[in-house]
Each structure stands twice: as structure tokens, then as C-alpha cells.
Amino acid sequence: MRILHTADWHIGQTLNGWSREAEHRAFLADLGEILLAEQVDALLVAGDVFDGLNPSGEAQRLLYAALAGYVRANPRLQIVLTSGNHDPAQRLEAPEAVLRELGVHVLGTLSRGPGGMDLDRHLIPLRDRAGQIRAQVLALPFLRQADLPGLRLGAEEGTEGAVTAALRALLAETVARAAAIAGTLPLIAMAHLTCAGGLESAGAERRILIGGDHAVPPDVFPPALAHVALGHLHRPQSLDGGRVRYSGAPFPLSASEIGYDHGVTLLDLAGGAAPRHIPLPRPVPMLRLPAQGTAPLPEILAALDRLALPDRPRAEGPFLYLALRADRPVTEITAALDAALEALPLRLAGLTITRPETARPAAAPPQDLTRTTPEALFAAAFRDLHGTEPETRHLSAFRDALSEV
């Protein structure tokens, strides 16, 4: 029994207005080749399939065309797809009746029955190519406050926060019931959350737990679970001795992820081997200048000149993040960058300009607002931020905005 675990596709993402559709098409094609080459029996997608709560029609077509293609290539392939915090949970489930006929299980929301979580829906048997059940997967969507019975925000259970305690209780009860059904078969869980000890991507992953808890310890997942396939953290990594695994995102979703070894995770139940990371090719380069820290404008311009860039349209070119240290007025920096980038097949994904602390004037004592004007305050703030006086167009725009207040 061979299971492939992936997560955090973020279909529909844009960077500074640039579409990433071509990258998602390339990844989904690569994934299809891996499914066939590795003779995968089941594909687990642990949340954040889409990048936003209102995915475009094209983003949805891209997803469903890929799923249909995988099943067409291997009619016995089983696919289990759960929601993440970015996903529109109910919209994800809308075509469930059709997808179920293709062997695709979609869990966007938590379903309950009289005895707790509805295991007829959330516990899914995984079959090998001979049709024999070889494992059971407990598929958990992204959990919200209402999904945690007994949650009392602000309360603490011993040394644990309220959310951790409520999640631990939910998993203990549910996994015990699921394990009784699984018997001697391996029991696998899917979830979308942050585990303590996991390495996060700066600025890329929202802190999604409630009630003040940011992360839960890996031991909230009971020992009866042979493997836990997680989504949310974009760096591929293992916790709890390898039992708890983040597959990571398929390619960089922000500048902080440029150095990651993106890929998918293969779990071979028959061989009993540790989960295996399968690297994915990077569809489009993502660059950061400088690689670390910041640099002044002349160094950035020189680095741009040294880049060996592919001969392709800008809309297909590498993504670029720039981190500058201001050595002149910001308006001069942006004008110089605009001129330099105009001739290069690069897509500017992000720009930060910081001023050295030594260049910042000492904080002035608070002004008596009865002795100044809004325009004078605007001009002072503009000087502090840009190192130069506001131009007439800046003052005109400020006056227009002020007149609307």
C-alpha cells in the first residue's frame, strides 16, 4: 500500500498581481507523473488547496481537471482531500456527490453524529490495487471553534491551553473509536494545524488557532495513529520521531521559502520504511536580492546586471524580491528600480526599503496639536519616511483626502 501525502497547494495565489497559474499547472502535471511512477494507491491532500475563500472559476477548473486526470490515469486511485484555513469549506464540498463516484473524498467541514464525529464520513478505508483494505484514514478538515466540544476560552486544563485540551479530548475519543474499527490495520490521520516544534515560514502562514493557543504539541495525536499527515506549515519536516509529518508546499509561496526543499511525501505501508521525501522541480525561479539582509541601491543594481536570466516574456520570468537599505530619498530609489527592471524579464513580487536607524532623526517631543495643522503633520511624516520634502502632487493628494474626512 503506497500513499502520497501533499498539502498547501494554494491554487489561485498571485504575487504582487502576477498569476501563478502556470506554476500550478506544472506542479499538477509533475504530481500526476509521480503518482504513476511510484504506483501510488492513495493521494492525501491535507488542506489549503485554494489560496482564498473565493477561488476563481479558473482555479476550480484547474483543481478538478487535475483530479479527473489522476483518476483517468489510474481508475483505482483513491483521493482524500481536506480543507485548510484558506479554503472555502462548503464550496469545496459542493461537488462531493460527483467526486465520490470517481473515488475522491472531500472533507470541508466536520460532521457529527449522536456518538461524536461521524466516522461513516470521516473514516475512509484505503484499498490496494487488489481491492483489499490495507489502512484507514481519519480525515479531519480545518477545525474551527464550534468543532471543539467543551471548549472554554480563557480556561486552562492543568498546564495546557483551552484549545489544546479540547483538541486532545476530541482526538482521544475519536481515535479510540476509529482504532476499534481499524483493528490491526494502520490508522492514519489528516489535519491542518500548527504543531509545536514545527519550523514556520516568516509572513507566509497565518497563526490559525483560537483562544490564545498558537500551536499544539504533537502528542495530542494518540499513539494509536501510525502516521499523521499534516498541512499548514510550508517547509517539509517531521515531528515526533517521524510519525507526524508536514509534506510542505509544492513550491515557494513567499520569499521566506526560497531555500526550502519542496516536495511530496511517500508512505509505503508494505515496506514499513520511514516516509520518503520526493523533491519537486521548481517551475519558475524565485530570487531575493540580496540573499540575506538588505543592500543599498548601487549594490542592488549591480546584482541585477549580473543575473543570468532566461529569454522569455516577463509574464513567465522569475519572481524577484528586493530588500533595500535607503541611502537616498525613496522616490529616487523607486525611480531607479523601475528603470532597471523595465528592461529585464523579471516579475517584482515584493519590495522593502528600510532606513538605517542612525539615519532616523531623534524622536521629537510630542507636538501641541492646537499649534500645528494636519498638512504640517503630513509633511513631517513624509520627511521622516522618505528623507525629502513632499512635492506639490503629494500635498494635493493629501488635501483631497483630508477634504473627504
Curated annotation (Swiss-Prot):
- Give the signal peptide range: none
Any one Pfam family match given in the protein's UniProt record, by short name: SbcD_C
Record GO terms (molecular function)? 3'-5' exonuclease activity; endonuclease activity
List UniProt keywords, sorted A-Z: Exonuclease, Hydrolase, Nuclease
Q: What does this protein do?
A: SbcCD cleaves DNA hairpin structures. These structures can inhibit DNA replication and are intermediates in certain DNA recombination reactions. The complex acts as a 3'->5' double strand exonuclease that can open hairpins. It also has a 5' single-strand endonuclease activity.
Q: Which residues form a coiled coil?
A: none
Concerning CDD domains, the annotation shows: MPP_Mre11_N (cd00840)
Biological processes annotated in GO: DNA metabolic process
Q: What is this protein called?
A: Nuclease SbcCD subunit D
**Whom does it interact with, and what assembly results?**
Heterodimer of SbcC and SbcD.
Would I find Hydrolase among this entry's keywords? yes
Q: Which family does it belong to?
A: Belongs to the SbcD family.
